[in-house]
Amino acid sequence: MDQSSEKELEKYINNRVQWDSLPSHAKSILDQSHVKYKQYCLKYSIKHQLRWDTNLISSFVTDERLYYQEIVRLSVANLVLYPYHIQDKLVPMLNVTPFKYYLIMMIETMTNSKSYDEIPNFTAVDCIRVLGIGRNQFIDLMNKFRSKGFLFKKKKDVIRGLLPTRSLEKNIEYWWILRYGYPNQDEERQGSLPASELEVLDDLKRSNGINGKQAGIYCRESVISLISKGLVYIDVPIQNQDTISVPPLEGFVMNRVLGDYFENLLYKIFVSIDERTTIQKLSEVLQINVELVKQACSLYCRLGFAKKKNLEPLLPQTPSPSSEGDTHSKWHHSWITYYQENETIIPQPILNNNNNNSNTIDNSNNNNNNNTNITSSSSSNTAINNSSQSSTLENNDNIVEGVVDESFNNGNEEQKRIGFVFDSSITAFLMMGNLGYGLKNHAVTMFERGKLSNEALADFLQELDKIDVEEFVDSEAKLYATNAISLRDTIRHLKNKYRIDDSNSSNSNSSSGGGSGNLQGLDLISCERMNQLDETTRIRVLKKNYSVLISMAPLSIDYCPVISSVPPNFGPAVYEVHSFWFRIYLYSMVGKGPNSILLPKGTRLKRIPTIFKDCEKILVCPIDHDPTTVNLSQLLPSVNETLLSSPVLLSAYTFIKYDTQPKLSKLMSHSRSNSIVSSSKDNQLLYHIPFPLDDLSADNGSPKKYTNIITNNTTTTTTTTTTTNTTNLNNNTIISEDQYNSDNIHTHPILYKIQSTFNLKNSFGYITLLKKETHILLNNNNNNNNKNNINNNKNNNNNNNNNNNNNNNNNNNNNNNNNNNNSITHQKVFEYLPLNVYYGIPIFDDKLNREVCAKIDKFNLLSKENLNRHSMDSRNLSLNLFNFISSTCPPIHPDLDSIDATKINSNLPSVQNIPFPTQIITFVNGNLDL
């Protein structure tokens, strides 16, 4: 059964369609078998833990108790989260509380000697909350278990004796609902429970138990004690109009991902949720049943990963002046005392600046308002930012950040933000770089949730400010620290500066991105998590929340970039731009680039291609991994292995070096030139130049002189003519060795050709040039005739020992051992070739990072007008690239001719499965050959 058929059957099951009402094509999927439909319905219902009484399964399984027992059995076996959404059935009917559920799961795991890493992420977090068993405790218990003898005991009995006997759940919120659990006469009989706990049980029984009451109206210690004894259980109510905020994750366990439906749902909502969007609106954007969204958000709050914003205040809003404030609170004083002792901020009534939502305080149980003593008061949906309640911030940057947050929160609820797209390389160096303990929670949030919201950036920046690069001695650690500083500067630059006006206002302000009004705010978005959403959902989420997307550069090839037409995206325009196709397209359009060969998947290299005979290292670019450099001696086995699973682009990277110094070997071996990138300016291999490029027409209007070395490569001994002339900038790439360096490389003519070809003046990023160093052979006696040359060479051979000290550096390279007839020397020749163009803001180079950010301000690239121009340029680039790919392999987009290039707000037919080449494509000496 294919995936589309499964989705169709699931739709009928969710809609409670009986067998007789199924359409004929659905019955044909099941081979006209009513039994198969029943089996599929049972399997789907248990897997998704559906309620028995409100779903189709009730018509196939008449025993409700047996159905829930099967859910528990399979859920424990598969290490699935406790099904809190059917807790009202599992506890009163089966007496299966979260504590008993996880106790059984832990016993089975330890009995079978499974690793702690096999417990899925969210399940492991809930085990810590209920059992108090984390990774270290699990290892300690396993060691104790192995050390104990169980000759006359069962393994499970030994393990049970090591595990806790009561629930350790203590992190309870006052607004959660307390419900009566499974009746236990032994525990409830007179004298075994304190009077305060008996009062709570009696009150819950009188209110029919299942309806429940808010935990905050009872003594906190009594509530926790009853939960630990299993006499009551907790429900976390979430309503359609609630808003949820997700602070940096604390206590998250990074184990394996289970991949079941609910875990996928949790991650999908994790990256999409924000505190400005109600639960109802979020379900509409994701097109997911609102009950499933409420289940996920309820679990977030239960695990401590999220906070509900529109809470009923713990303290009274207007206490009477003649009495103490807490005497007018409906909440038990123990909760107020607990928050005062353990929390920095007591939940307060929520202020509102939007008159349209003046009466939206959540009623935690709207259906049972009278029974649960839940009241509602007049307040708004927009919460006071926690940072505004803290003390004065430490520095001016943090003050600005506080102003940004305040201006954002007091503005329109639908204010859009800037989205900065990152990949897992950012989270890797934040977690593994030993940069500070405070950064780890933020890194885990960025990796697991896939987003770091604007509200959490102030604390994130404070942690980044603590990094001192000079403290790190190790070069790799210092590199991580430098990258973190670049990330900090980028966040601060984007967060505190830009206003992007979505309206048609013509006002522009170069210092603020061209818009007016409140500052945007900034969200950090993981491309991996965002791409886990299906395409239509991803487009809706991005369009709703963001005014512009900006990618880090370069994004890893291992992950697809976030593609978007609306909002405008300063990153790879389509997936193909993020692949080797764009490199080949760049070389063919500019007419310059390293000699390259694109090999289809399955090709076998039997010998090294002749265009690489003088190379030392080759750049290997698979379609789904980052490029790597390979020594020429290892090229064949390495590339042939990669070609088994992926097409490969091979490009010349470095060349064999000839030594021009005296008394040294002429040919430097591969092993002696492993280090291809040096800190020396003359030995620099790659140059990264930010764009847009500065206009050089203002330099007095006078042309510059360039020294070209014109070579003829048809023979081994090359005759050269050195000429100095005034030439056009666009025709000079081969230059003398001292012409360009890191200070003036930005004036190289090839850069301006690339910018004009791809309209880079409306975007930002950087161009990478490869410094090609080759050696040519010079004839030092080209002023004499051949006869004199031969005679001179004979005399040189006869008197070699007498003339060694008088020879210049070029004669030191003379091939005396082979008795050559000519005096030949090697001379270095440099050529600067485009390697790639990267869109976005670089993080790996602090200097380049500052230069790109300065370009954004200088050219006003985030203005409303430029956003439209950039969108048009990106669309044209995408269409041209599609046509180029289609000209080299079977077309993947047959409707390219029907696409209107002027409709910048419509999506292009890009696909994540980048097309594979079907033939060998070569780029040699500026010519593309198919």
UniProtKB/Swiss-Prot annotation:
Low complexity composition-biased segments: 352-392, 780-822
InterPro entries attached to this UniProt entry: FAM91 (IPR039199), FAM91_C_dom (IPR028097), FAM91_N_dom (IPR028091)
Gene inactivation effect: No visible phenotype.
Pfam families xref list: FAM91_C (PF14648), FAM91_N (PF14647)
Disordered: annotated segments: 349-397, 780-823
PANTHER family in the cross-refs: PROTEIN FAM91A1 (PTHR28441:SF2)
Entry's family note: Belongs to the FAM91 family.
Name of the featured protein: Protein FAM91 homolog
